[in-house]
Amino acid sequence: MKKVLILLVTMMLCACSPAEPMSLKDSYGQYKQEKIVYANKKDYIKKKDAYNAYLVYEINKDACTFESDLKYQNIQYKKVELSKDEKEKVPEALIKYNLYEGEKQLGIAVYLGEETVYISSYDQYDGSPVYIARMKKITKKS
């Protein structure tokens, strides 16, 4: 009975507190890599868990929002056209953003569908995209 009362009070307090939108940083650990949709290096295809955890962002048809989790402080993004080659390699791609910190390009974000998180990384030597990965939200099963 005591546990039920505590649970009810907790639920009432949660309902009364103002709801703030949850940022992607708040849910940073709630996503796992579901599928690599493009990779130009064989080792990334083999390593299903290989990605740059510092570049995690959520994109939709109107904007690109992202959290840098301390490593990068001032990330800007620029919407760019998909090349013919990119459209062939990633046919699901609808919109592409280049991500920058100052003059340095960090990576790309590609919009493939609504409310899905994607990550990508650039090769530091030749500047080409290494992979684009689809992320899946982890849901807790009770």
Task: Locate predicted features.
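Positively charged n-region of N-terminal signal peptides that target proteins for export
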Residues: 1-4, 8
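C-terminal motif of bacterial Sec signal peptides marking the signal peptidase cleavage site
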Residues: 12-15
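N-terminal helix-cap/turn-to-beta initiation motif at the start of protein domains
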Residues: 18-32
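A glycine-biased structural micro-motif
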Residues: 26-29, 46, 52-56
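Contiguous, well-ordered beta-strand patches that form the walls/edges
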Residues: 36-42, 59-113
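Short, surface-exposed coil-to-beta transition loops
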Residues: 50-53, 102-107, 127-133
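Short, solvent-exposed coil/turn segments at beta-strand boundaries
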Residues: 55-64, 110-119, 137-141
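Edge beta-strand at a domain terminus
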Residues: 71-86, 118-142
